[in-house]
């Protein structure tokens, strides 16, 4: 089942319909990012103007060697981090990501799925029912063995880091049902040493969730 429905109305106009009660928060993000957009209450859809809209998965396949350039990866980090912070202010948080969750709208990267989005209580995501493990997961989700269960919202920092590693290096941190170890991750990201992205990844892929930061400097 599709997480969202994207339709091309004409050459430069699109409609986007997302499912889930929490979709209004994602619509609000899109309205902040895209200047020319209108929300239609009757259809629970947003209409916007853009020259090019494609799924992020397809966008990656169109890049050289199926990888983002360093500059495009910086844009990915900046765009998605802003959306994470916005949702946190609204007391919502992602617990992980799937590549199908993201659209590329005129080279801007936008979350378009509420599947992995839950309310926050005291900066924690509360799990009261079973979930499907997102492909860009985090160590905390593997500890989810009983319900109810709570995880600090910073768990998604690791998931974003895993997405960035895949987008830039074409390498998954999740293999089967196991995440790479810290030593394995250090080896994977070693080619990025002394770049802004390298230190960003070191911060958000920290084993200790309390030490994780979304900071690109």
Language-model segments: residues:
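A conserved short helix/loop substructure at the end of the activation segment
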Residues: 203-216
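Conserved end of the kinase activation segment
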Residues: 140-153
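Protein kinase catalytic-loop region centered on the HRD/HxD motif
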Residues: 81-93
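Conserved catalytic-loop aspartate of Hanks-type protein kinases
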Residues: 156
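Conserved structural core of kinase catalytic domains
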Residues: 29-71
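Activation segment/activation loop of eukaryotic-type protein kinase catalytic domains
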Residues: 94-136
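Activation segment signature within eukaryotic-like protein kinase domains
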Residues: 76-77
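Short, conserved alpha-helix in the C-lobe of eukaryotic-like protein kinase catalytic domains
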Residues: 159-171
């Amino acid at each position: 089942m599709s997480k969202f429905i994207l339709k091309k109305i004409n050459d430069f106009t699109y409609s986007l319909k997302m499912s889930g009660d929490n979709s209004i928060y994602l619509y609000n993000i899109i309205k902040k990012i895209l200047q020319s957009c209108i929300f239609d209450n009757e259809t629970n859809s947003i209409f916007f103007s853009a020259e090019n809209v494609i799924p992020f998965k397809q966008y990656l396949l169109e890049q050289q060697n199926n990888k983002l350039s360093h500059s495009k990866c910086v844009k990915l980090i900046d765009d998605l981090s802003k959306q994470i912070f916005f949702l946190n202010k609204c007391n919502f948080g992602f617990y992980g990501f799937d590549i199908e969750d993201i659209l590329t709208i005129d080279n801007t990267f936008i979350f378009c799925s509420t599947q992995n989005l839950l309310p926050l209580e005291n900066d924690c995501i509360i799990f009261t029912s079973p979930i499907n493990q997102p492909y860009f997961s985090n160590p905390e989700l593997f500890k989810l063995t009983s319900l109810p269960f709570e995880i600090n919202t910073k768990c998604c920092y690791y998931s974003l880091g895993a997405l960035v590693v895949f987008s830039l290096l074409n390498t998954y941190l999740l293999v089967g049902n196991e995440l790479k170890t810290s030593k394995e991750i250090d080896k994977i990201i070693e080619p990025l040493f002394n770049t802004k992205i390298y230190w960003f990844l070191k911060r958000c892929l920290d084993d200790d969730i309390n030490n994780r930061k979304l900071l690109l400097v």
